[in-house]
Amino acid sequence: WDTYNQLYQFFTPAPTYYSTMGTVFDAEYIDHHPVFDTLIFGSFVWLGNVVGSQNMGMFLYALLQCAFTAAALSLSCCYLDKLGVPKPIRLSLLVFVAIFPPIPNWAMCMCKDSLFSAVFILYFVAFIEIVRTKGAALGSKRFLACYVILSGLCILTKKPGVYIFILSGFVLLVVYRRFWKRTLVALIAPLLLFSFAFPAVVYPLIGGVASGGKQEMLGTFFQQTATYLLEHDDATAEELETIKKVMNIDAAKERWNPQISDPAKNS
């Protein structure tokens, strides 16, 4: 239903009813889900309208995302050669990602998680290369530019992506402080370009964007909290009062689903 809400925003003028939150916003776009994803998904469906079928636009998107995901997975398998992983293991992994049904099924979905997954694979490979070279890889301007772009895409394609990037960036800055200037650029540049400059420039061009709920960025923590409260009864009264300030405990426990965090985080 996330993609449904995003497409609804793209094609419907303000005010916009956001079904997940049960709220009407006096804006065409809401950043409850990444606006970058909303613009991409909507553009492909719009392109489908131009050629006479929304299905064609969605099919083209699925095709390109499948190719992008396949390329990311293939690159990661090739990178294992650089790490000295034996060829039989590399080939086995390649075969696994090629024939394990959930992977292609996930890759063809028009949703933020599928797009983020492919981006994150590439980001993670770049991160490992920095660790492998003990920070020296950032000395290459080309590599640094690629890392900044991949970091930015992590930030743009999924709300928790910024947390992953910041935490890992601080680790690099502390561990490889010998290259502190490069690691500082690798940390600051994506934040300036994609967390601040992108919204400042793009949001006014599309008519402004309303702020959504904070729970989208904190979904994992909501899910973990609800799981703990369901499985344990040792939370103190003080802890429960603190939790109640950010989530409805009874609703979260009632809606809790072990497979996805949406029911808990929307409580």
Regions picked out by a protein language model, each given a short descriptive name:
Residues 88-91, 133-152, 182-186:
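Short hydrophobic alpha-helices at membrane interfaces in multi-pass membrane enzymes
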Residues 35-39, 54, 58-62, 94-118, ...:
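Aromatic- and kink-enriched transmembrane "portal" helix at the membrane-lumen/periplasm boundary
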